[in-house]
Amino acid sequence: MVTGILGIKKSQSQTFTEDGKRIPVTVVSAGPCWVTNIAHYGNFAGVQLGFGNRKHITKAQEGQMKKAGLDKKPRFLREIRIPTHPQAHTGGESELGTPPVSASPAGCKVGDTITVGDVFAPGDPVRVTGTSKGKGFAGVVKRHHFAGGPRTHGQSDRERAPGSIGQTTTPGRVYRGKKMAGRMGTDTVTVRGLKIVAVDPQNNILTIKGLVPGGRNGLIIIQKEL
């Protein structure tokens, strides 16, 4: 069975439990999604989901949709990996082209429609993957939480400077990955430990306890914690 779905982050709100406790929630417009392809990777099946609509798609995507028997022009295409073996795990190596464990190891077939009611129920633990908000060009204090230099003792413009970037090597060079100023944000972020509060299959709405990465109307991937 498919363990995830694609959605659009809509808004952040709050709700109250039966005992009056306030909890922050995120409202997500999720699905319906269409299964556009299924690939097999050893102990995993990669289920490609299409979501949203657009006016034009590439010729290659048109051929893929025709092969899947779908009269759709999805805006997004993303793959979700599903374990097909009881001892499957997310680490280690996998072999491409390994025969499937069963005729339909992913619990679905190409052309199927997936809705929030098919995947989630209130109380399910989930993880959400999205693209974090872009912050533009940022210095090391904001981007990497550097302490900065001293404000006094003869210093005039060192308060938010990165300091030395040398490594006392011969020949002298800057190591790859050195934390420096640059563009901040727009990173792929996964938040774990979230929980489904409510499912509205009629309106394709998920309410998730906690905050999810990204800005409003950003694409997110919601997956069950297995």
Locations of the language-model features?
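Extended basic (Lys/Arg/His-rich) segments that typically form rRNA-contacting surfaces
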Residues: M1-L226
